[in-house]
Amino acid sequence: YTGDMLFDYPLIQPKNKRKFLLSIYPKFHTQLFSDSILKNEVRNAEDLVKDVSFSNSIHKLYISFMPKTANLKRGDILTIYRTNDGMGAARFRSVVTSICQVEEVKTKNDFISLDDYLNYCNSYSIFQKDDLRKWYRNDNLVVIKMTYNIALAKRLTRGMLLDEAKISPTIY
């Protein structure tokens, strides 16, 4: 272990690292984390995931409007939480699927222009350019670049997080 997140990839050293839960809507989760497709999605896997750079890369880019995500720092560990798809109770359908590590976080103020922002997002973003343009107008814009380190074989449901990990039900 060298301490360089890219050189050590996929190894993560959790000691002395901050850890967070990052919730992602199902429609974005599957495209972004192609190795974390749920069993109930497998029959549609070919339709859900195309052979594109953002699906195949270890680098992932996600847009958030949750103000506290701007406080993320390089090396922070993100537990990816796929939110409920509306097909049943969140207790069973919202799950932790993956572990990532923050590479870089940028807010709207870090970009000198719309073009600068679009160029930054171009390589690893799952989002359409029209959406990126629209979202750039939002002052709460946070762009999170992360490495996709682990797709969990056993998924943790919201119920498990509430009952066993004692995570607050009001957190998300």
Feature map (PLM): residue ranges:
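Intrinsically disordered, low-complexity coil segments
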Residues: 86-91, 134
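Short coil-to-beta transition motif at edge beta-strands of beta-rich domains
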Residues: 68-87
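Contiguous surface segments at macromolecular interaction interfaces
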Residues: 1-41, 51, 94, 105-172
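A generic structural signal for short beta-strands and their flanking turns/coil linkers
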Residues: 76, 96-98, 142
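Histidine- and/or cysteine-centered catalytic micro-motif in compact active-site loops
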Residues: 83-85, 101-105
